[in-house]
A protein has these predicted regions:
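Conserved acidic catalytic loop of the alpha/beta-hydrolase fold
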Residues: 78-95
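Conserved HGGG/HGGXW glycine-rich cap/lid loop of the alpha/beta-hydrolase fold
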Residues: 19-72
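Acidic catalytic loop of the alpha/beta-hydrolase fold
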Residues: 221-226
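Flexible "cap/lid" loop of the alpha/beta hydrolase fold
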Residues: 108, 112-113, 118-149
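Short beta-strand/loop motif that positions the catalytic acidic residue
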Residues: 211, 217-219
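Conserved alpha/beta-hydrolase catalytic His-Asp/Glu region
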Residues: 132-136, 150-209
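Catalytic active-site module of serine/aspartate enzymes centered on a nucleophile-bearing elbow/loop
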Residues: 241-275
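Alpha/beta-hydrolase fold catalytic core
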Residues: 1-30, 51-55, 92-93, 202, ...
Length: 275
């Protein structure tokens, strides 16, 4: 394999072993893992900016976009193994790994399973050790899913959670983009992945002290389900963890406040690279 710094790679799209991916830019490898119900296109504001400094790899997690389905009852390590296989295919030994929401669970699982392959890990809008009320709500949503796709009321409720209700006028366009992704997600893939997401908030409780690399836990001040308290708790548990809270933002801050999210990510990654 090759070192994380790669040069001479033109932007490209591909599919390997049922995983659809895109690569853009040159430099140290940086991996972007989207959340449940989305696909790699949701990272467009990050890819546009970060490809100037990094070799940015975004991909569709199992059950999403153009990637294959996960197992009927998947585990987090199945999603982590998907990323490991993709990095092998791309000849990337080590990388900075960034996840959002469900993607943060995968990023942390990957960092714990393959620490030698992770220079730094950033968990955006991550869930961790939900309160009983939070857990009951997400488990109820998971139990209501079937393989027939998201009904319009469910999509409306999700957009309201992620953007506020009503959606602020200046966010209407990006909210419609997110709504369209939810409406077209593979229904089986979404249901299988969401059930795992709903039940995995304690997957890293007691394990974060094993994170050897720099770890950033960043969320929005107004995100009720991936709360600032969760990010602070994770940062306190990780030996090299730190929390960043973005003022006035909610769950989809990578598309509602891309400039500040990108700036915080670049600052963190550069500091991690010097550590």
């Amino acid at each position: 394999m090759k070192h994380e710094t790669m040069t001479g790679h033109a932007p490209m799209n591909g599919v390997f072993d049922g995983t659809a991916y895109s690569v853009a830019g040159e430099g140290p490898a940086l991996i972007l893992i989207h959340g449940v119900g989305m696909n790699r296109s949701v990272w467009a504001p990050q890819v546009d900016a970060l490809q100037l400094c990094f070799r940015v790899v975004s991909y569709d997690m199992l059950g999403h976009g153009a990637s294959r389905l996960p197992a009927v009852s998947p585990a987090l390590d199945e999603y982590a193994a998907q990323l490991a296989a993709l990095l092998d295919h791309l000849q990337i030994d080590v990388a900075h790994v960034v996840g959002h929401s469900m993607g943060s669970l995968i990023a942390l699982e990957f960092a714990l399973h393959y620490p030698q392959r992770v220079t730094s890990v950033a968990a955006l809008n991550a869930v961790y050790d939900r309160t009983p009320t939070q857990r009951a709500a997400v488990m109820q949503r998971a139990a209501s899913l079937d393989d027939g796709g998201l009904e319009q009321p469910s999509i409306d409720a999700t957009v309201a959670r992620w953007f506020d209700d009503p959606v602020p006028g200046h966010l209407a366009q990006v909210a419609e983009l997110v709504r369209s992704l939810l409406a077209t997600v593979n229904p089986e893939g979404y249901a299988r992945t969401y059930r795992l997401f709903a039940s995995s908030d304690q997957a890293h409780v007691g394990r974060l002290p094993q994170l050897a690399m720099p770890a950033l836990f960043m969320t929005g001040e107004c995100d009720p389900n991936s709360s600032p308290a969760m990010s602070h708790s994770m940062a306190a548990a990780a030996p090299r963890g730190r929390a960043e809270i973005i003022a006035n933002e909610r769950h989809m801050m990578n598309v509602t406040a891309p400039a500040i999210v990108n700036q915080r990510l670049v600052q963190f990654i550069r500091e991690a690279s010097r550590a």
